């Protein structure tokens, strides 16, 4: 209704995009977020959320571009840096992803999500001991969530037969 009254109401387009995302209607979410950005091109939250939705759609290059554009304009946007690392990992660029994650850890200490992200990239690269060590550190900080993520994460598929991995996630 708000969009009918004012088609240039960026917040209404953003909210519509969020709702579409929650309904797993990602193409429609992107369309609404694009409309929001047409109304308010400088809205960082909308641009960021657009990157998140592209990531959910497995459109990792587009997601990466969203996060890189945010970082160019807002070089201290740590969430954009983190998600840039995630998208690099999804594209198989694990060394670059780990470089980003290491920089975040230098600034923000032992963030459990970042430690987990480094673990999964190490698993994907075959650095089993390091992956398991970091996974163990992450599990110590957030047992329930990290175990669930690790079990479902394809980056850890190569570790499914590893006794230490099975022990960590049971």
Provide a role label for each language-model segment.
Residues 1, 22-35, 56-69, 91-103, ...:
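Structural signature of tandem alpha-helical TPR/SEL1-like repeats
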Residues 123, 128-145:
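TPR/TPR-like (Sel1-like) alpha-helical repeat modules
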Residues 145-170:
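Terminal, low-structured helical/coil segments at or just beyond the last alpha-helical repeat
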């Amino acid at each position: 209704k708000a969009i009918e009254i004012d088609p240039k109401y960026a917040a209404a387009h953003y909210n519509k995009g969020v709702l579409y995302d929650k309904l797993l209607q990602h193409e429609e979410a992107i369309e609404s977020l694009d409309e929001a950005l047409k109304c308010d091109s400088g809205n960082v939250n909308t641009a960021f959320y657009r990157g998140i939705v592209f990531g959910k759609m497995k459109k990792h290059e587009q997601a990466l571009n969203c996060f890189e554009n945010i970082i160019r304009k807002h070089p201290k946007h740590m969430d954009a840096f983190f998600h840039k690392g995630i998208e690099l990992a999804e594209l198989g660029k694990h060394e670059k992803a780990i470089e980003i994650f290491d920089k975040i850890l230098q600034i923000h200490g032992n963030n459990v999500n970042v430690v987990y992200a480094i673990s999964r990239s190490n698993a994907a690269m075959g650095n089993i001991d390091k992956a398991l060590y970091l996974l163990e550190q992450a599990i110590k900080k957030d047992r329930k969530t990290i175990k669930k993520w690790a079990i479902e994460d394809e980056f850890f598929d190569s570790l499914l037969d590893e006794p230490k991995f099975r022990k960590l996630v049971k």
